[in-house]
């Protein structure tokens, strides 16, 4: 600059970014666990099925919550809260290839790809797209229905599309 100080182009350190994400997730989940413990709420992680009006059988899990441990137990309760979470849909026609990732895998990529194809114009895929666009990836979206974010207010979707149009090279609707 004019004063003799130049700043280079911004650079993203994906490893540090991922580390920060993990810290935030750890704080959030740790905070929820602490609040539950403080209120004497028993938490169980696993796949459950009600076996009575006040009993649930749980097959416990570990890690990300999807790996079954083989341990089952029946939990008695007066009141039950189910925090179901979510799991990405496996598309049977997709090849088993490290370049194909779901939303969980997209949050763990080692580097920012130059180009990405997002299958599905739903909220989660578009959210991932806006993140990777901000990090420098070029994006295309394929959606088999006639509009993005099905189920969302159409007027809001139009505003979102207008505000984010430059993030996406192509949005292909009614496309399989």
Can you name each region flagged by the protein language model?
Residues 110-152:
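Rossmann-like NAD(P)H-binding beta-loop-alpha module
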Residues 1-112, 145-149, 153-174:
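Glycine-rich flavin
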